């Protein structure tokens, strides 16, 4: 009989919820457009986004394509998906989106309005209700701001298999995935994020630095 991989705590929960539980939620996490976000703010965004994804009918293991610039929405999409047991994949809008979607096979996508025009043809492969747009020009899609606002700010984090995918980066030709065990080790200083190769994901380095700052409960540069 095959040995079942050990289960581990959810990485997003250990990153953020641990700070809240230890009364460090009022610490400054990052700033965006002159607004300061505390770790309590990050926790609420993460949980509301995870609940939004559940509301779209996504299940554990579902992939969520993120086409977003450095912003609170990208943090929320990434951590919310991970905490909900899903797999966020950081896309790069200029990198062959049709091929990306064919390989990633996302169940949903969160897209910034500034990428929507160039991405819309590729996103037609997804159900229209599965595309959520950040910004005011949603073009008939769900509005991220409106949808998140109506979600509960609490979300249970299931334990996950250590070898289950937690986070992915589109490299231009393939998806580079990290397991929960690998991501947990990374945020505490061991190893590197994937996303290299001939067409590295431009977000990988900045996201890695931000996650490590989160693990220390420090001010982070938004990614």
Each model region followed by its residue ranges:
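AMP-binding/adenylate-forming domain of the ANL superfamily
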Residues: 3-28, 44-45, 63
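Conserved AMP-binding/adenylate-forming core of the ANL superfamily
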Residues: 26-71, 75, 79, 95-98, ...
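AMP-binding (ANL) adenylation modules
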Residues: 18-22, 56, 69-72, 198-205
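AMP-dependent adenylate-forming
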Residues: 15-39, 134-136, 165-174
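ANL superfamily adenylate-forming
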Residues: 114-189
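Phosphate-coordination loops involved in phosphoryl transfer and adenosine-cofactor binding
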Residues: 60-62, 162, 193
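Structural core segment of the AMP-binding/adenylate-forming
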Residues: 56, 79, 83-146
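Conserved ATP-dependent adenylate/AMP-binding module captured primarily in the ANL superfamily
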Residues: 78, 92-121, 184-223
């Amino acid at each position: 009989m095959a040995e079942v991989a050990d289960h581990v705590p959810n990485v997003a929960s250990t990153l953020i919820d641990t700070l809240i539980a230890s009364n460090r939620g009022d610490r400054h996490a990052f700033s965006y457009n002159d607004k300061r976000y505390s770790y309590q703010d990050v926790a609420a965004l993460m949980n509301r986004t995870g609940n939004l994804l559940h509301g779209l009918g996504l299940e554990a293991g579902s992939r969520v394509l993120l086409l977003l610039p450095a912003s609170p929405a990208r943090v929320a999409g990434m951590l919310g998906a991970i905490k909900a047991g899903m797999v966020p994949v950081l896309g790069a809008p200029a990198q062959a989106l049709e091929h990306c979607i064919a390989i990633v096979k996302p169940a949903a996508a969160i897209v910034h309005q500034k990428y929507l025009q160039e991405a819309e043809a590729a996103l037609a492969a997804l159900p229209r209700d599965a595309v959520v747009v950040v910004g005011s020009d949603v073009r008939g899609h769900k509005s991220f701001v409106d949808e998140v606002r109506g979600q509960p700010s609490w979300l249970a984090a299931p334990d996950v298999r250590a070898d289950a995918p937690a986070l992915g980066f589109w490299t231009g030709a393939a998806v580079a995935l990290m397991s929960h065990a690998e991501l947990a080790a990374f945020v505490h200083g061991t190893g590197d994020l994937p996303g290299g190769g001939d067409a590295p994901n431009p977000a990988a380095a900045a996201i890695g630095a931000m996650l490590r700052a989160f693990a220390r409960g420090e001010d982070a540069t938004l990614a």
